[in-house]
Amino acid sequence: MGQKINPIGLRLGINRTWDSRWYANTGEYGKLLHEDVKIREFLTEELKQAAISKIVIERPHKKCRVTIHSARPGIIIGKKGADIEKLRKKLSEMTNADTSLNIVEVRKPEVDATLIAQSIAQQLERRVAFRRAMKRAVQSAMRLGAEGIRINCSGRLGGAEIARMEWYREGRVPLHTLRADIDYGTAEAKTAYGICGVKVWVFKGEILEHDPMASERRAVEGDNQGSSSNRRRENA
């Protein structure tokens, strides 16, 4: 089961939590869920170059709080915060609510599964050899503290006539172990021969306490070696 299912979904409520954190009445649920999808699609398209890892949406009473985890926060913030203010106004128009926008810097993009997948997909689009791209990503992740990593690439790799799947793994990736902190990300490479899919699993160690926020806290604070400053920029 652990080999097939999304490892983040399998661990929700154990050491992972949801990216949409709000409650709604039955009549409002569908509308708010559709809003979340539109917000994520808009930000992903608008901030293609910002290396976005994930987008967290929270909805306190009659408000909306959007947190963007990015490896390049400067691109989102812009000169003197001009770009982030434009984004905030657009999001307020989309949600019809008072919207705040927070930026959290991803300190180690080399061990973030989503950013690794995006990087490999971009290299495939630039015609870099898929084995070289995979091996380079694996070496960088292991060098920067990952305990294990697995990468799958599928499609017409290298322009082959028949689509196939190639994978590369180093270290341990225990998908059945629920206490394992496993990050998972996917991306698509639009090549001249068709779409190639990229999947990445990164094992970052084990989380022994039962805490749904443990993995996120480790990602935000762990890179700073215990420092209380996590360079969180907030624009209410």
Curated annotation (Swiss-Prot):
UniProt xrefs under SMART domains: KH
Segments of this protein annotated with the region Disordered: 214-236
Keyword match Ribonucleoprotein: yes
Gene Ontology molecular function terms on file: mRNA binding; rRNA binding; structural constituent of ribosome
Any one GO cellular component localisation term in the record: cytosolic small ribosomal subunit
Keywords for this protein: Ribonucleoprotein, Ribosomal protein, RNA-binding, rRNA-binding
Pfam families linked to this entry: KH_2 (PF07650), Ribosomal_S3_C (PF00189)
Gene Ontology biological process terms, A to Z: translation
Domain (KH type-2) ranges: 39-107
Protein's UniProt keywords contain rRNA-binding: yes
Annotated family: Belongs to the universal ribosomal protein uS3 family.
Subunit structure: Part of the 30S ribosomal subunit. Forms a tight complex with proteins S10 and S14.
Functional note: Binds the lower part of the 30S subunit head. Binds mRNA in the 70S ribosome, positioning it for translation.
Protein's name in the database: Small ribosomal subunit protein uS3
Source organism: Brucella abortus (strain 2308)
Lineage: Bacteria, Pseudomonadati, Pseudomonadota, Alphaproteobacteria, Hyphomicrobiales
